Amino acid sequence: MIGCDCVVCRSPDPRDNRLRSSIYVQTPECSWVVDTGTDFRTQALRENIRTVDAVIFTHSHTDHIMGFDDLRRFSHVRGSMPVYASVETMHDLERVFQFAFKTLDPFPWYLKPEPHVIDGSFELGGTLITPLPVPHGDSIVNGYLFSRGGEKLVAYLSDCSAVPDEIAREISQVKALIIDALRDKPHPTHLSVKQALEVAARVKPEATYFTHISHELPQAAEARLQASARIGYDGLRLSF
């Protein structure tokens, strides 16, 4: 947090140094990123990301879209960049990044989005991607379920203030639940640690990882969670 001297902001544990929430998915067929926050360029350089074949957006808040233009390098390499988003999020992307979405673009080095409005499940390579609409305060945003060969691998719910029963049933017994857990105290647009654990108890995943964590939740708090969940950190890698 800018200008903050709290315990987490002064922590020597590198896992307490958190950038904006995002995930990079790599499969034998292709790779994609979910959300391009303000820190996307820093994250891509740090993790040595060399290919991005598509981008999927959860919603259009600035902490999830403002690194969009840094996809131009990957777009230039492959000729265009498939963009998957809800109709509302796509509209906001087109408004904020008008220069990129222009039909006639005189600058060949610009990012060239290839818009795909999400209206149901879709596939990237051999992965089935199912949108999971969840409330984020007064808004509805998308989480995603990633499945391969009929197996539910990852449910990604980075921003939510509740998880409806039908969504919990859809992702039941997923291998990994990555879920919003902002802090211990309740928040109007994000889940608290207690609420996230309650969702996990309903979903019964093999493993639970917290994301979108504020500076009010230190990495050291993972000790009190015991085996129920892990606090995610920048650079965490999961393999299936």
What do these predicted regions represent?
Residues 164-240:
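Binuclear metal-ion centers of metallo-dependent hydrolases, dominated by the metallo-beta-lactamase
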Residues 14, 37, 160, 186-193:
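A conditional alpha-helix N-cap/helix-loop micro-motif detector
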Residues 49, 134, 160, 181, ...:
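Hydrophobic pocket-lining residues within nucleotide cofactor-binding pockets
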Residues 39, 61, 161, 182, ...:
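Catalytic metal-binding/acid-base residues of hydrolase active sites
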Residues 1-157, 166, 223-239:
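Binuclear metal-dependent hydrolase catalytic cores
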